[in-house]
Amino acid sequence: MGFLFGTRPTPTSIVNREDALPGRDEPILPHPAPHTVLGTPIDGPWKDGQRSVVVGLGCFWGAEKLFWQIDGVESTAVGYAGGYTPNPTYREVCTGRTGHAETVRVIYDPQEVSFEDLIRTFFEAHDPTQGFRQGNDVGTQYRSVIYAQTDDEVQKAREIAESFSHSLADAGYGGITTDISLLSDTPTKTMYLAEDEHQQYLDKNPNGYCPVHSTGVACR
């Protein structure tokens, strides 16, 4: 069956470990430059008290901009998490053979913005019911994910998702497909930084195109 109007079918599963690309030992971005908007390190060291959460909500360019604009967020970086391939490249992730999602690591001050508020922003900024796609972006790398640091954060995120699922259902949407788990429970237990050209992409390329795909449903 051919593709219609340039579209392609949505994948139904993530690659397994045995079929994933081998990757490499060396990081793709060994010496990252400071954040082009916030002026802070994007790969540490972090200040005492700072917290982090890794999220994926489709194309990471627009997602990163969404979070760096939030008061209390002190750094952001884009990368790849949730899969098997160590230190993957963007091209490799786009093949669907790494198992990774495009993600944003958000470093924040919990005295200024709460984990819960960041998660509510996350859910409101995309359609978490679409499985392996966001809008016209199709592939397992565009799946919805939350990779938290603690069991308590996982529980809080799941409670918010459960509450939001009722609002989505009332608006005619299907079930939430977001993977909510500990980053330490993912196969590689980390987020690998993406190439420099992808870091703060929409600051470096103000006319770049990468919209968020909000449902318009409030997450309370």
From Swiss-Prot:
The active site is at C59. It comes from the Bacteria. GO terms for cellular component: cytoplasm. Its EC number is 1.8.4.11. Pfam families: PMSR (PF01625). InterPro entries: Met_Sox_Rdtase_MsrA_dom (IPR002569), Met_Sox_Rdtase_MsrA_sf (IPR036509), MsrA_MetSO_reductase (IPR050162). It catalyses: L-methionyl-[protein] + [thioredoxin]-disulfide + H2O = L-methionyl-(S)-S-oxide-[protein] + [thioredoxin]-dithiol; [thioredoxin]-disulfide + L-methionine + H2O = L-methionine (S)-S-oxide + [thioredoxin]-dithiol. GO terms for biological process: cellular response to oxidative stress; protein modification process. GO terms for molecular function: L-methionine-(S)-S-oxide reductase activity; peptide-methionine (S)-S-oxide reductase activity. Keywords: Oxidoreductase. Belongs to the MsrA Met sulfoxide reductase family. PANTHER family: MITOCHONDRIAL PEPTIDE METHIONINE SULFOXIDE REDUCTASE (PTHR42799:SF2). Has an important function as a repair enzyme for proteins that have been inactivated by oxidation. Catalyzes the reversible oxidation-reduction of methionine sulfoxide in proteins to methionine. This is Peptide methionine sulfoxide reductase MsrA. It comes from Corynebacterium kroppenstedtii (strain DSM 44385 / JCM 11950 / CIP 105744 / CCUG 35717). The gene is msrA.
